[in-house]
Amino acid sequence: MMKIKRFVYSLPEEEFYELVYSQNLSVEVLERKEIEVIFASYKEIEGLTPEKVEEVKEDWENWKEKFKPIEVEDFVIIPSWKKPVIVKPGLAFGTGLHPTTQLCIKALKKYLKEGMTVLDVGTGSGILAIVSALLGAKRVVGIDIDEKAVNECRENAELNKVKVECFRAEPKDVNESFDLVVANLEIHIFERVLKDILPKFKKIGIFSGLYKEKDLKRFEELLGGLKVKEVFEKENWYAVVVEKG
């Protein structure tokens, strides 16, 4: 635990948003009145006199959790420790909103180690490939059978200033193996291509797109004895982590 100072301010709503936008501030909104916003900052804001200064004891991680992205008009103000992924809206190849995408990101955050090589099967808009690169993967390859998806993957990788090799291909066309493979597909697709995906990873496989326990059970049958390391669940969707060795 650590002691930190919290500066509490009050401003008319319009001035509050102008301040937050112009100075790129991370603040905690404490209360909204009719035309006034009462907010706190964990550092003193130049040019403003705080209504009060509090000394609080708080865990650093919990303190950081209080700072959330703030939307102001067409802008999103993001705390420096967050990793934004910029996505150009496309033709339903993935926006990050679906539970399966979120489960894959959660698994990547836990199991992807810096310096790993990664293959993203069914890359779509490239979100999982981009996240892998941002997490420190040494090399990231994204494949998809749809040329439009491949183009979106390339565009989004450029927007995020990360290197992702995007190709139109099926798993059987890949002639190398990777430390980690991530595949967010559907059970009927896994029934057809999982046999081609499994040889492509050396250490960790992350698989999602599985709905309810019937899909989960069927997927485990397709693994052919490989060890399930962990299962993630959200809103009846599952992601499975498979480990080799």
From Swiss-Prot:
S-adenosyl-L-methionine binds at residues 101, 122, 144, 184. This is Ribosomal protein L11 methyltransferase. The gene is prmA. It catalyses: L-lysyl-[protein] + 3 S-adenosyl-L-methionine = N(6),N(6),N(6)-trimethyl-L-lysyl-[protein] + 3 S-adenosyl-L-homocysteine + 3 H(+). GO terms for biological process: methylation. GO terms for molecular function: protein methyltransferase activity; protein-lysine N-methyltransferase activity. Methylates ribosomal protein L11. Keywords: Cytoplasm, Methyltransferase, S-adenosyl-L-methionine, Transferase. It comes from Aquifex aeolicus (strain VF5). HAMAP family: Methyltr_PrmA. InterPro entries: Ribosomal_L11_MeTrfase_PrmA (IPR050078), Ribosomal_PrmA_MeTrfase (IPR004498), SAM-dependent_MTases_sf (IPR029063).
